[in-house]
Amino acid sequence: MDRIRIVGGNALNGIIPISGAKNAALPLMIASLLTSDTLTLENVPHLADVELLLRILGNHGVDIAVNGRRERQSGSYSRTIHFTCRTIVDTNAPYELVSKMRASFWVIGPLLAREGKARVSLPGGCAIGTRPVDLFIDGLRALGATLEIDSGYIEATAPKGGLIGASYTFPKVSVGATHVMLMAASLARGTTVIHNAAREPEVVDLANCLNAMGAKITGQGTATITIEGVTSLSGARHRVLPDRIETGTYAMAVAMTGGDVTLEGTDITLLDTAVEALRRAGAEVSAIEDGIRVIGHGDAIRPVDIVTEPFPGFPTDLQAQFMGLMTRAQGVAHVTETIFENRFMHVQELARLGAKITLSGQTARIEGVQRLRGAPVMATDLRASVSLVIAGLAAEGETLVNRVYHLDRGFERLEEKLTRCGAIVERISD
C-alpha cells in the first residue's frame, strides 16, 4: 500500500495547474447514459473514482474513447473522453462496483429515465457518516417511480409511458439528489419543479451540459430549478469546470507554508466564502488572468472561525484543510461542521503532529501552536488525508501519510504538483 513521505519546512513557489472537478465530472459522465449519441467531456481528471466510474458505465453499455483513442490515459493532466451509449445493455449496478464509490449510485436516475427500470446497489464511498439515500428515493417517487429496497439493492420501476413531471421539495439540501433529479426529470413527461435544490457550481455545470444535450432546464444556481421534460437528448461537447476544492486546498497549503503560487486554470468566483476566510487568516488571494494568485505568510496566520454550509457557504470538503491551516494560527479558532456527522476523523491524526484540538459536538476548538512536528499519520477519508499532507508541509521533519489511496480518489498527481513548487513530497510503494 502506497504512502506519501513529506519533509516539511519549504515555502511553495511556482505554478500549480488546477484539474477538472471530480464532483462535476462524475455526474457529467453518468449523464452519458441519457442519450444514444456521443457526449464528449473535456478536462476530465485522472482519478481513481473516474476510472471506477468508467468501468461502471462500460458495464451499462457505454463505449468509451479517451482523447479520441482507446487508451487509459495520456501523459498530460486532465483529458478529453468521448462517451457513446447506443444501447443500455444492463440496468443492474452491482454491489462490487457501487459499494466502492457513492456517486456511482446516481446511475439510477438515467437508467430509470431511459429504460424505465433500474436495480442499483446501495452506495459506498467515504466513511463520513450515514449519508442516507432517502432523498433520492423520495424524489424519484415524486416522479411516479416505484422503488423498493431488497437485499441491499434498490429496485426501481417507472410508470408505463415513463417518469412524470412533478413539483418536489427536498427536506434537506442534497447535491447528489439534485443531480439525480435533474437527469431523471430531463426525460420525464411534463414539467418538474425542484424546490430547495442544491446551488453548487457542479449542479449548474450538469444543468448546462444537459441543456447543451437538448434539455430544458432553468433556475440552476438558485434554490428552485424547473425542468421541462423532452422525449430524447442528443450528444454534446462540454468542458468540466475547474475543481474548486483542489483550488482551495492548494491555496490553504500556500497560506500555511508561505510562498507565492499561481493556481492556473481556475476561477476565484467558485469559492468566494473560502477565499474570504483565507484573506481573514492573512493570506493574499487575488484573481489574475486564467487563475488565482496566492501569497502566504506562514508564521503570521490569524485565527478564523468558520461554519460549513451548502453553497454559497463554506464548503464541507474544505473543512479538514482549513482546520489544518488553523493549527498554526496565532490564537484560537473554531470550526463547526453542519453538513456531515463524523467528519472530524482527521483530528486525532493532526494531534499526532502536535495540533491542539478539542471537540464539542459538531464544533472543533483549535488552539494554534508555534510549530508542528512530523510523524506517521493515517488517512481516514479523501479530504482528511489531504489535510494531513498540508500539515506535513508545514511541520518540522518527516511526515508519513499512510493509506493514500484516499488521495488518489480526488487529487490528480498531488505529489507532482507540490514538488514542482518546491515541496519535498514523494510516493513510497511498499
Swiss-Prot record:
Modified residues annotated as 2-(S-cysteinyl)pyruvic acid O-phosphothioketal in this record: C126
Pathway per the UniProt entry: Cell wall biogenesis; peptidoglycan biosynthesis
Ligand binding (phosphoenolpyruvate): K22, N23
UniProt enzyme class: transferase
Keywords: Cell cycle, Cell division, Cell shape, Cell wall biogenesis/degradation, Cytoplasm, Peptidoglycan synthesis, Pyruvate, Transferase
Keyword Cell wall biogenesis/degradation: yes
Assigned EC number: 2.5.1.7
One GO CC term, this protein: cytoplasm
Pfam families listed in its UniProt record: EPSP_synthase
Places the protein is found: Cytoplasm
Classification via InterPro entries: Enolpyruvate_Tfrase_dom, Enolpyruvate_Tfrase_sf, MurA_subfamily, RNA3'P_cycl/enolpyr_Trfase_a/b, UDP_GlcNAc_COvinyl_MurA
GO molecular function, one term: UDP-N-acetylglucosamine 1-carboxyvinyltransferase activity
UniProt: UDP-N-acetyl-alpha-D-glucosamine binding residues: R102, R131, P132, V133, D134, L135, K172, V173, S174, V175, D317, I339
Catalysed reaction, written as an equation: phosphoenolpyruvate + UDP-N-acetyl-alpha-D-glucosamine = UDP-N-acetyl-3-O-(1-carboxyvinyl)-alpha-D-glucosamine + phosphate
Keyword Lipid biosynthesis annotated: no
Active site: C126 (proton donor)
UniProt-listed GO biological process terms: cell division; cell wall organization; peptidoglycan biosynthetic process; regulation of cell shape; UDP-N-acetylgalactosamine biosynthetic process
Functional description taken from the UniProt entry: Cell wall formation. Adds enolpyruvyl to UDP-N-acetylglucosamine.
Family as reported in the entry's similarity comment: Belongs to the EPSP synthase family. MurA subfamily.
Protein's UniProt name: UDP-N-acetylglucosamine 1-carboxyvinyltransferase
Gene of this entry: murA
